[in-house]
Amino acid sequence: MPRPVSATPAPVAHVVLSSGFSRRYTAGVREFAVEAKTLRDVIKEMDRRYPGLGEYLEEETTVAIDGEIHEVAYYQPIRQGCEVFFIPKLEGG
């Protein structure tokens, strides 16, 4: 009898929001453990937990993964234990 194939669990990322985002969307909670394979998955999970947050993260932030800033990071892979930090975009002038 063949053995069932088990799906590989997604890595768990340490997600950090700025205090402004957390006050607006998560009642002040700034840090989260999120199971995800890509940054897109992180954003979708954050939006599932806090409706409306995903769109805001996509449009109004830049993201740093383990200290490296990514302007376009939607499909960046997530590694176990990595830190994902959402940074407010700076407006030029």
Q: What is the meaning of each model-derived region?
A:
Residues 1-92:
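Ubiquitin-like/PB1-type beta-grasp interaction modules and other compact soluble beta-rich domains
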